[in-house]
Design a protein with these regions (language model features):
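Beta-rich nucleic-acid/ligand-interaction surfaces
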Residues: 36-40, 205-208, 493-494, 498, ...
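Glycine/proline-enriched, intrinsically flexible loops and inter-domain linkers
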Residues: 7, 20, 60, 198-298
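Extended, well-folded interaction surfaces typified by the phenylalanyl-tRNA synthetase beta subunit core
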Residues: 418-580, 715, 768-772, 776, ...
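Conserved mixed alpha/beta core segments that line enzyme active sites in large multi-domain catalysts
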Residues: 44-74, 154, 248, 259, ...
Length: 801
């Protein structure tokens, strides 16, 4: 909280009060931690005298002045000497944990005692025992007691001197509030919440009589991806530690202090929410910065020592000859700052958020900077941040700031304007506020009224203000959500329902599960090797795939164009686990590119896939499909056309599924070689239906008919049929010639054997007739059967005797 109080000096609330109020006003606090929660009675003491312990070679006896008295403390620390100022926990006080850095809940209470016969009235502390780490306090020894600087005041609180009397607060900042990604934004919200004055840092003009433009030239080749780029130069740089107050601020935000130069860039990033970068200007070839897109396949070594390959969508920061950084993500190893740096080039820029997000994913590198840039920063913030960094360099004596700033501004962001409608705001909130009251609340967060246009003007850092509802939210936040009166809605409720496509998918699930299939879910990304495994030809459209730019691995590097691999892999897993009979289904998407390389979004198709082994055959699969079609409202006949073109299916046991002349899927037995590739030793059957292809035929306008009053009459047809005649052709004859009295038919037998002449097969149908208005007469049935038999005879079919 101390960092917040630097900009809201009158803020005087407890951590709990702060947390509750900030959350209620819209800046949600996840939690807070008091750094001194487990510390008590710890003061700065000065060692006046050290003596050897009479009975222990590794212990010493120290006389320590704690301001009010001198106490005797026995310690084994090897790093203390007479005159050192150290943290001392007194009798009855508490430390956070042991020297191993492990905190103890509630702390460890220190009592006076004897060490090898010598009384000790307290304990000198390491930084770990105070609940912190050497990373946060670089000056602390690797092992031993923490030593204060010479100007530390004996007797004062060691907790306060170390900055451990602070509270670390964790916020949950939504992505639309980019202004709150910096401490200044949070402080502005705190000032508004507690009605205190917000005092931002005053940035003074810095720099000598020289011009930065004489030191470096900047060219932005892609203004769309880099709306603003600012650069300033600092020469005669002196690398050293940053001041303690800056180190404490960074440590509270989880950033390890390094040196004054690095700490200043990190400090400004945390303060303004504006990422910065520093280059050693002497490593910049030609003293020139060029912001350009990477070349496809260009390789670059980042600060973390990793070589990364770019594509032509990644924005690079380059000098006259080479790349020196990935824009908005990370700098390069070839321009990193060392302790020997003489002249520094500061960069503060605004990059296209969408491009940074996609680039970060492509190269597999996400940083604090990219996380901020991808939200979309205010271009107007870059200049303020770089000037602040130069001001700190000058104030801390870290270098000589060169005058002027190279500022390439390709986008001037104007304040957003929203019509001010008090009546609508009151109606939306259910309040009765006056115009003046609303304006007072809005003024807290720098939203002002333009009286000439009657518009609310939002500063450029508030890019979340777009419409009247956004303005109403700001009024509600500071009026108080808890003060808004409770009212009941008076509108009419409407019944919601699932989209039509999802209803069809649910029918598919219901039918599949009713028929004994279990649902499976497989990855949408696969290995390019699956096409060979499935025996898919090299020229097949299924091999035209979308390659993932940042895959989990080679086995997940493409978007699938068929669901068969996932289904067969799942069946294989069950087969290997010795499950003897398995039925699975999946409803999942395939991704079919319209053109490669991608210029538009792919065609995403939803496939209903069935797979089984040891639990049925080709005809069982047909039955499931027909049941699904019927329950989806597809009442017309389904046609199965033999096919032999799908190389992953058995050439003599596969068929395309058609409805009203449109191919909507296929089914068949998996080719034995493909089944073997997956390690399945059983006959395996699959079916695939394209959900999008059947939607135009589906419907849920069910018609109900009463129970039939009149009896049905059944006739069996046993026929000798040429082998090339399909069951569908016979059924077409039945439907066309059966008339209105034909109720249903069912194929119940197919036979080929010695008793049937060569080139023929035996087929038998059960045909049901019924008239819903009267009892059928034998003459009607005979006449209808004659029509049917004539139609069958025309196909070369003979009736068996």
């Amino acid at each position: 909280m101390s960092w917040i109080k630097m900009y809201v000096p009158d803020l005087d609330v407890t951590a709990q009060e702060y947390t509750d109020a900030m959350t209620l006003s819209g800046t949600k606090v996840e939690g807070f931690e008091k750094l001194d929660a487990d510390l008590d009675k710890i003061v700065i003491g000065q060692i006046e005298k050290i003596e050897k312990h009479p009975d222990a070679d590794k212990l010493i006896i120290c006389q320590v002045n704690i301001g009010t008295e001198t106490v005797q403390i026995v310690t084994g620390a090897p790093n203390v000497k007479e005159g050192d100022k150290v943290p001392v926990v007194l009798d009855g006080g508490r430390v956070a944990g042991g020297h191993d850095g492990q905190k103890t809940p509630g702390g460890i209470k220190i009592k006076k005692g004897k060490l090898r016969g010598v009384e000790s009235f307290g304990m000198m502390c390491s930084i770990e025992e105070l609940g912190s780490t050497k990373e946060m306090y670089p000056e602390a020894p690797e092992y031993g007691i923490y030593i204060f600087p010479e100007d530390a005041v004996v007797g004062e609180s060691a907790i306060k001197a170390l900055g451990l009397d602070d509270v670390v607060i964790e916020y949950e900042i939504t992505s639309n509030r980019v202004d709150c990604y910096g401490v200044l934004g949070i402080a502005r919200e705190a000032a508004a919440t507690f009605d205190k004055k917000f005092v931002p840092p005053v940035i003074k003009e810095t720099g000598n009589d020289e011009k930065a433009s004489d030191y470096v030239k900047v060219t932005v080749e892609d203004p769309e991806l880099c709306p603003r780029y600012t650069a300033r130069v600092v020469k005669n740089v002196k690398i050293g530690p940053s001041p303690k107050w800056m180190q404490r601020c960074l440590a509270s935000n989880g950033i390890r202090p390094i040196n004054n130069l690095v700490d200043i860039t990190n400090y400004v990033m945390e303060e303004y929410g504006q990422p910065m970068h520093a280059y050693d200007l002497d490593t910049i070839e030609g003293r020139e910065i060029v912001v350009r897109r990477a070349k496809a396949g260009e390789k670059f070594v980042t600060l973390d020592g990793q070589e990364r390959e770019m594509d032509d969508q990644v924005l690079m920061i380059c000098d006259g000859k080479k790349a020196v950084g990935i824009a908005g993500i990370m700098g390069g190893e070839n321009s990193m700052i060392t302790d020997n740096v003489h002249t520094v080039l500061f960069e503060a820029a605004c990059f296209n958020g969408t491009n940074i997000r996609l680039s970060s994913k492509r190269i597999g590198l996400r940083t604090d900077a990219s996380g901020k840039f991808e939200k979309g920063l205010d271009p107007n913030n870059a200049k303020a941040a770089i000037d602040r960094a130069c001001q700190l360099m000058e104030e801390l004596g870290a270098g000589e700031v060169v005058g002027g700033c190279v500022d390439i501004c390709n986008e001037v962001r104007e304040p957003s304007r929203v019509p001010f409608e008090p009546e609508r705001i009151n109606a939306l909130l259910g309040t009765d506020l006056t115009k003046e009251e609303m304006l007072a609340y809005l003024a807290k967060v720098e939203l002002t009224l333009d009286p000439e246009t009657n518009e609310i003007v939002a500063p450029t850092f508030r890019q979340d203000i777009h419409c009247m509802a956004d303005v109403a939210e700001e009024v509600a936040r500071f009026f108080g959500y808890d003060k808004i009166p409770t009212t009941l809605p008076n509108g009419e409720a409407t019944t919601g329902k699932l989209p039509f496509k999802l209803r069809i998918e649910n029918v598919a699930r219901d039918i599949a599960e009713y028929c004994g299939f279990s649902e499976g879910m497989t990855y949408s990304f696969e290995s390019p090797k699956v096409f060979d495994k499935l025996r898919i030809p090299e020229n097949s459209d299924l091999r035209k795939v979308i390659t993932i730019s940042n895959p989990l691995g080679e086995d997940y590097s493409i978007m699938r164009t068929t669901t068969l691999n996932g289904m067969l892999s799942s069946l294989a897993t069950n087969y290997n686990r010795r499950n003897k009979a398995v039925r699975l289904y999946e409803i999942g998407k395939v991704y079919l590119p319209k053109a490669l390389p991608l210029t538009e979004l792919p065609d995403e198709r939803t496939h209903f896939t069935l797979g089984m082994y040891g639990a049925g055959d080709f005809f069982d699969m047909k039955g499931v499909i027909e049941e699904f079609f019927e329950k989806s409202g597809m009442k017309k006949k389904v046609h199965y056309t033999p096919d032999s073109n799908k190389t992953y299916l058995h050439p003599g046991r596969q068929a395309n599924i058609s409805y009203e002349g449109k191919v909507v899927g296929y089914l068949g037995e998996v080719h034995p070689l493909v089944a073997g590739n997956y390690g399945i030793g059983e006959r395996t059957y699959v079916a695939v239906i394209d959900i999008q292809d059947i939607l135009e035929f589906c419907g849920f306008n069910h018609k109900f008919t009463g129970i039939a009053k009149y009896p049905a009459v059944t006739r069996d047809l046993s026929m000798v049929v040429p082998k090339h005649i399909l069951a569908g052709q016979i059924e077409d004859v039945l439907e066309q010639r059966g008339g209105k009295i034909l109720e249903s038919y069912q194929l119940f037998d197919i036979y080929e054997g010695a008793q049937i002449k060569p080139g023929y097969k035996s087929m038998a149908y059960s045909v049901v007739f019924r008239d819903h208005e009267k009892t059928l007469e034998e003459a009607e049935i005979t006449a209808t059967m004659k029509k049917i038999l004539n139609g069958l005879t025309a196909l070369g079919i003979e009736l068996r005797s």
